[in-house]
Design a protein with these regions (language model features):
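Membrane-proximal transmembrane or re-entrant/amphipathic helices at the cytosolic face
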Residues: 224-279
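Transmembrane helical elements of multi-pass membrane transporters/channels
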Residues: 1-57, 219
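Alpha-helical transmembrane segments
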Residues: 134-142, 190-207
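Short alpha-helical transmembrane segments in multi-pass integral membrane proteins
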Residues: 70-91, 103, 168, 172-197, ...
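Interfacial segments at transmembrane-helix termini and the short loops linking adjacent helices
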Residues: 90-124
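Membrane-interface helix-loop junctions in multi-pass transport and translocation proteins
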Residues: 145, 153-187, 226-243
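Helix-loop junctions and terminal segments of transmembrane helices
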Residues: 45-63, 68-74, 134-135
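Membrane-interface junctions at transmembrane-helix termini in multi-pass inner-membrane proteins
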Residues: 123-153, 164, 168
Length: 279
């Protein structure tokens, strides 16, 4: 509960700081935050919420081998999914904002600035679900203090960076401060897992970090190539970039024998056809 309270307080602080950095900054921050939250919430609901009961079950049975496998799977799956999303937002943030809010009194300048803020929020997007999984792991192990303390540290970091970066970068600095605070919380949570090192191991996750990063490199290259080819139409370019680059990304993951991508594909098939994924 404390962690939720800290998150709400963080958002309140962001809005308060935004009111001091420029005209319309609060609205810009809210628009960008809404889009960013859509991506984060979808993943959080589909993976974290589904995994938490199983985490609790393994913890209650003290089956730490299976618990470690589940944690590694969740962390790796999150990273595989979030890598293309983050790169896509980085390259097409203005298109996303234009599709979502580009009407009425929302000007080109508003779209550009909101897109830049969205990009800086997206830098922290990759840490938000990882933090959620790590937090659920602590809760399943009966440790509620560590996530709360780390959230409080993140809040202090966020407030401090809001003041510094907000002064120099305006509303963009507030978004960057939020992303950095998410990164700090996540890194601390994963680092503090060493207290459970006799039971929980996330070495598999660390050893296989190169796979989504390698896929991300090919994804970025394909994004840039498609962006150049379809430069005559921004919206067609963004659509084709997503489809073709995602196909290349998945191909790279399959070629590197990334088992999480097979799990994700099977999971989606189960959901699509209404089958029991555990059978």
């Amino acid at each position: 509960m404390m962690g939720i309270g800290v998150a709400e307080l963080n958002r309140l602080v962001d809005r308060m700081m935004a009111s001091f950095v420029g005209v319309g900054a609060v609205s810009i921050l809210n628009y960008a935050s809404k889009i960013n939250t859509v991506f984060a919430s979808c993943l959080d609901q589909t993976v974290s919420v589904a995994a938490f009961p199983t985490m609790s079950e393994f913890s209650a049975k003290k089956d730490y081998t299976q618990l470690s496998k589940l944690i590694n799977l969740c962390l790796s799956a999150y990273l595989l999914i979030l890598t293309p999303i983050t790169i896509y937002i980085a390259l097409y943030n203005d298109v996303i904002v234009s599709l979502a809010f580009g009407r009425g009194k929302f000007t080109i300048d508003n779209i550009t600035l909101t897109g830049q803020v969205l990009f800086l929020f997206a830098l922290g997007l990759i840490f938000m679900p990882l933090r959620s999984i790590a937090t659920n792991l602590y809760y399943s192990l009966g440790d509620t203090k560590t996530p709360s303390y780390n959230s409080m540290i993140g809040m202090v970091v966020n407030i401090g960076l809001n003041v510094i970066l907000g002064y120099y970068l305006g509303v963009k600095g507030l978004a960057l401060a939020t992303s950095i605070s998410y990164a700090v919380i996540t890194i601390l949570l994963l680092a503090n897992l060493k207290k459970f090192s006799n039971w929980i191991s996330v070495e598999y996750f660390y050893r296989n970090l190169y796979k989504p990063l390698l896929g991300g490199v090919f994804l970025l290259i394909s994004f840039l190539l498609v962006k150049h080819i379809f430069a005559f139409d921004v919206f067609l370019c963004s659509f084709m970039s997503f489809i073709l680059s995602l196909a290349i990304y998945i191909l790279v993951l399959v070629l590197t024998k990334t088992k999480e991508i097979i799990y994700i594909i099977n999971f989606l098939k189960c959901k699509l056809y209404g089958k029991d994924c555990n059978s």
